[in-house]
Amino acid sequence: MAIYKYTVVAAEDEELLLGNLVKKIEQTGLGFRVIGTALTGSQAYDIVKEKNPDLLITDIRMPVMDGLQLIEKVRNHYPLTRFIITSGYSDFDYAKSAIRLRVSEYLLKPVEPDELYSALFRIRNEFEAERSEYLG
């Protein structure tokens, strides 16, 4: 039985990709549990407000509110939340915006399991380091 330490909300406007992403996250064995999924940025924001996850993984292009707008809104209200962007676009303007918003990782679709594992591993290590620092 896996021990979950970190909560995740995943946002992706393509249901099949969203389902695959959730499976990949939970199969890493790194302690991340998906506590909410959304097909739009506005749905994702509502879930974040309700559940305050440790990590938000979002597609960059979604209806109603795109991933960058979502991250900016979440960052303003929940500054401790970490972010991973998934995108089918390697456009440098998107990457610049992600850097400006202090996104932890930018993964190109289709998201490969080893790339997701590496990204989650780095984020988990950041969480652990912060926890150790906080606990002294």
Q: PLM features: what roles do these ranges have?
A:
Residues M1-V8, Q27-T28, E50:
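Short, Lys/Arg-enriched, disordered terminal segments
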Residues K5-L17, L21-V22:
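Conserved acidic segment of CheY-like receiver
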Residues A11-E12, A38, L56:
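Conserved sequence signature across two-component system core domains
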Residues N20-I25, L116:
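Short hydrophobic helical patches associated with two-component signaling proteins
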Residues G29-V34:
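A generic structural motif
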Residues I35-S42:
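Conserved Asp/Asn-Gly motif in the active-site loop of CheY-like receiver
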Residues Y45-L135:
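CheY-like receiver
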